[in-house]
């Protein structure tokens, strides 16, 4: 029996290691062997209460390439919720009577979890709820790491930039902590350091981690360099100018890197990765974004199919 059938996917913590491996294995099979009719006759709602480019287009492309019909909206201001003041609960209650699954993004933390209470058993897939969770980003990150490194264990992973507010690094650390032998290097200004609850979680699992002031300190040791954008609005102007210069990756910084090392980024990048990095064999952020199709296809296929034969 497929353990993800009709399951809500709200947080990466909703998935066990075995379920993560099932999603990644399914993603690899779908990448190697497209299934254009796998979700034929299924109707999926794409409900984006908050603006999105990559996530919405990636999800909707995933739906279409599996043969599903797609309904929904990309701007809630033109819906009854936006124009007439309808509650999220009522909106989800109605939409769930039309479709087989609901993909939703919402600016309010906890909105996706709330939606599960009103969906009548129709699975909710969280495409991002405020600064809280973005589980499908984590799935495509894991898929890319496994694809480039051949494993998800015994890896050295550096995370750089805004580690305090960046939901992608929190979820990725939690997911990778389910696999043995990984070591983390956290590179961030003090004001944007990894939250204590993540560090405590790693300590409880006996996972080694360390904090560093610059990328150069760890370049020769890591398999994955996960860059994030330092958000200007989080720092005072003088501190931002200093931090911005300190956490920029250039091609010249990669000279001592391992040959297998890949640079990842959840995108959009601003100027934290110089464009000269794009031409190096280490740059993998555009392929990473492309892998979102297969990770999301896998999740949709598993949630909607009792038995998945690929």
From Swiss-Prot:
UniProt subunit comment: Heterododecamer (2C3:3R2) of six catalytic PyrB chains organized as two trimers (C3), and six regulatory PyrI chains organized as three dimers (R2).
Biological function: Catalyzes the condensation of carbamoyl phosphate and aspartate to form carbamoyl aspartate and inorganic phosphate, the committed step in the de novo pyrimidine nucleotide biosynthesis pathway.
Protein name per UniProt: Aspartate carbamoyltransferase catalytic subunit
Coiled-coil boundaries: none
Residues binding L-aspartate, per UniProt: 84, 167, 229
Keywords, ordered alphabetically: Pyrimidine biosynthesis, Transferase
Transmembrane segments: none
GO annotation, cellular component aspect: cytosol
Lineage: Bacteria, Pseudomonadati, Pseudomonadota, Gammaproteobacteria, Enterobacterales
Homology family: Belongs to the aspartate/ornithine carbamoyltransferase superfamily. ATCase family.
Pathway listed: Pyrimidine metabolism; UMP biosynthesis via de novo pathway; (S)-dihydroorotate from bicarbonate: step 2/3
Residues binding carbamoyl phosphate, per UniProt: 54-55, 105, 134, 137, 267-268
Highest taxon listed in the record's lineage: Bacteria
A single GO molecular function term of this UniProt record: amino acid binding
Organism in which the protein naturally occurs: Enterobacter sp. (strain 638)
Catalytically driven reaction(s): carbamoyl phosphate + L-aspartate = N-carbamoyl-L-aspartate + phosphate + H(+)
Alphabetical list of InterPro entries matching this protein: Asp/Orn_carbamoyltranf_P-bd (IPR006132), Asp/Orn_carbamoylTrfase (IPR006130), Asp/Orn_carbamoylTrfase_sf (IPR036901), Asp_carbamoyltransf (IPR002082), Asp_carbamoyltransf_Asp/Orn-bd (IPR006131)
NCBIfam families per UniProt: asp_carb_tr, PRK00856.1
GO biological process, one term: 'de novo' pyrimidine nucleobase biosynthetic process
């Amino acid at each position: 029996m497929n353990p993800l059938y009709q399951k809500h996917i709200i947080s990466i913590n909703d998935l066990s290691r075995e379920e993560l491996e099932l999603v990644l294995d399914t993603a690899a099979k779908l990448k190697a062997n497209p299934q254009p009719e796998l979700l034929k006759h299924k109707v999926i709602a794409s409900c984006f209460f908050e603006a999105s480019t990559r996530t919405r287009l990636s999800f909707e492309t995933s739906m279409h390439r599996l043969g599903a019909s797609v309904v929904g909206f990309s701007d809630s201001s033109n819906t009854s919720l936006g124009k007439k003041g309808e509650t999220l609960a009522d909106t989800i209650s109605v939409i769930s009577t039309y479709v087989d699954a609901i993909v939703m993004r919402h600016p309010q933390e906890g909105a996706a979890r709330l939606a599960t209470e009103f969906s009548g058993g129709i699975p909710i897939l969280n495409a991002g709820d405020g600064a809280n969770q973005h589980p499908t980003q984590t799935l495509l990150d894991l898929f890319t790491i496994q694809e480039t490194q051949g494993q998800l264990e015994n890896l050295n992973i550096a995370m750089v930039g805004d580690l305090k507010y960046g939901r992608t690094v929190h979820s990725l650390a939690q997911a990778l902590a389910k696999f043995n032998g990984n070591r983390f290097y956290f590179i961030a200004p003090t004001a944007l350091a990894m939250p204590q609850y993540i560090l405590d979680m790693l300590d409880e699992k006996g996972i080694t981690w360390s904090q560093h002031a610059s990328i150069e300190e760890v370049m020769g040791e890591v398999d994955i360099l996960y860059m994030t954008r330092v958000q200007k609005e989080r720092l005072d102007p003088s501190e931002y100018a200093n931090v911005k210069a300190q956490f920029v990756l250039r091609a010249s910084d990669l000279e001592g890197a391992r040959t297998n090392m890949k640079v990842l980024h959840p995108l959009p990048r601003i100027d934290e990765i110089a464009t000269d990095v794009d031409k190096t064999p280490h740059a993998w952020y555009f392929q990473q974004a492309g892998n979102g199709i297969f990770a999301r296809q896998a999740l949709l296929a598993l949630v909607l199919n009792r038995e998945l034969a690929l």
